[in-house]
């Protein structure tokens, strides 16, 4: 069961509304192949109950191939927001391919069974997936031009998964928190294919993924034990077991720069600056500034107030300021004038009007006017959505302030775009390196 923002109510699982025997969640490649194998052997769909990364409805919840954990029923979470918060915590904790259990939720006389997620694909399997003959065109169903294709047509995905731990982001549910990545050879092969496209002008727009500078799991223990329950790898402080290493990503970008027909290789996906700062070797940071920024680098501090950042699952603002100072120094050393563009979010649970004023003061002090500000909207499954709906932080079951009133949400957002309000015609300024 999940909170639906558009209906402003808790809805039951989509499996109860869709005429389907089985649901595949996550990236789905391994689960889909295994389902196909069993169906080819005439196994009835209702007997396919033990595949990771799948969910199904059962009369009692028995029969899953995984250890079951019960969470509050659909009826309970509809009636009691505390029960909803408890259910969210259970679902989040068990979303792990190694230590996770099957989550059972009774609903209207039947039981939803959500098996643990599938294990990440191996590097070899991920390479094979990206070696398939993609045409890099929009689907034929689209009869008109799709402008967004131009940015992604000549971009390359090199990794999958994210251990960043942002509470408002659903990526952990789609791709998992364990990072896996393609081999350098696989990415280079794709770059060589790009150079054969008549539309290619020599510029690879992005070499990234959910977080561009992740290439491997955050620590060696994850492959044996899974992700730590109830802990984040990066926030509010980096884990002491964090393995911050950009050497392979640096080598990948160096290889791409040497591909015949490639003029420039840019990194436009989100860089996790907190992870970057943990790497004692700063070669990647220097090469990023030297070769891979197309005028401006986008990063996501999201806010400047510590309490708000804690609710978001983000590092504190002093980490961003430290990164900004080092970024300035590297640009000055190389004689470059490149900008830093921070992504910001308004009205996240825990953010008050006073907190937005403090962020507006920072923007005023730095002369920065964001052209775009993300106003928080709840999306199914995330911890932040649970906070929004219940007013409870599911991690520790404590109350959270929530800006639900449309007027206050609009005001919080407007404070971050203060120059627009007073109609100043001075050109928009970025966080300039000058």
Model-found features: residue ranges?
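Terminal amphipathic helices with adjacent charged low-complexity linkers/tails
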Residues: 48-70, 182, 195-230, 385-392
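N-terminal pre-triad scaffold of radical SAM enzymes
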Residues: 143-170, 203
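N-terminal [4Fe-4S]-dependent radical SAM core
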Residues: 85-155
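Catalytic cores of alpha/beta
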Residues: 349-364
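Single conserved hydrophobic/aromatic residue that forms the stacking wall/gate
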Residues: 422-433
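Conserved SAM/AdoMet-binding glycine-rich loop
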Residues: 193-341, 345-349
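Conserved, mostly hydrophobic/aromatic
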Residues: 21, 187, 299, 373
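Glycine-rich beta-alpha loop elements in corrinoid/cobalamin-binding modules
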Residues: 1-107, 115, 401
């Amino acid at each position: 069961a999940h909170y639906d923002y558009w209906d402003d109510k808790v809805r039951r699982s989509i499996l109860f509304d869709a005429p389907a025997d089985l649901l595949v969640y996550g990236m789905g490649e391994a689960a889909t192949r295994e389902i196909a194998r069993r169906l080819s052997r005439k196994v009835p769909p209702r007997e396919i109950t033990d595949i990771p990364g799948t969910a199904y409805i059962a009369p009692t919840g028995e029969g899953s191939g995984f250890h079951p954990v019960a969470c509050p029923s659909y009826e309970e979470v509809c009636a009691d927001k505390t029960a909803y918060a408890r259910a969210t915590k259970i679902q989040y904790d068990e979303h792990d391919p190694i230590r996770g259990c099957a989550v059972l939720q009774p609903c209207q006389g039947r039981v939803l069974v959500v098996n643990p997620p599938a294990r990440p694909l191996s590097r070899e399997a991920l390479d094979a997936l990206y070696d398939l003959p993609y045409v890099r065109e929009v689907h034929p169903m689209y009869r008109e031009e799709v402008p967004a294709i131009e940015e992604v047509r000549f971009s390359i995905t090199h990794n999958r998964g994210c251990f960043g731990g942002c509470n408002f982001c659903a990526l952990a549910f789609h791709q998992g928190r364990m990072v896996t990545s393609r081999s350098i050879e696989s990415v280079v092969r794709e770059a060589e294919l790009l150079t054969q496209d008549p539309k290619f002008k020599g510029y690879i727009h992005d070499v990234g993924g959910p977080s561009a500078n992740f290439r491997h799991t955050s620590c060696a223990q994850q492959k044996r034990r899974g992700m730590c329950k109830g802990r984040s790898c990066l926030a509010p402080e980096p884990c002491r077991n964090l393995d911050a290493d950009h050497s392979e990503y640096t080598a990948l970008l160096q290889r791409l720069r040497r591909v015949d027909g490639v003029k420039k290789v840019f990194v436009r996906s989100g860089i996790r600056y907190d992870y970057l700062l943990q790497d004692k070797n700063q070669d990647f940071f220097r090469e990023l500034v030297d070769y891979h920024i197309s005028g401006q680098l986008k990063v996501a501090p999201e806010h400047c107030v510590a309490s708000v950042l804690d609710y978001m699952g983000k590092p504190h603002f002093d980490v961003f300021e430290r990164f900004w100072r080092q970024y300035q120094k590297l640009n000055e050393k190389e004689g470059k004038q490149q900008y830093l563009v921070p992504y910001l979010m308004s009205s996240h649970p825990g953010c008050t009007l006073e907190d937005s004023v403090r962020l507006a003061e920072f923007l005023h002090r730095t002369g920065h006017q964001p052209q775009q500000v993300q106003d928080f909207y709840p999306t199914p499954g995330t911890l932040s959505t649970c906070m929004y709906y219940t007013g409870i932080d599911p991690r520790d079951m404590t109350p959270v302030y929530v800006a639900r009133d449309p007027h206050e949400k609009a005001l919080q957002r407007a404070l971050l775009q203060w120059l627009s309000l007073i109609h100043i015609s001075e050109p928009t300024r970025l966080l300039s390196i000058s």
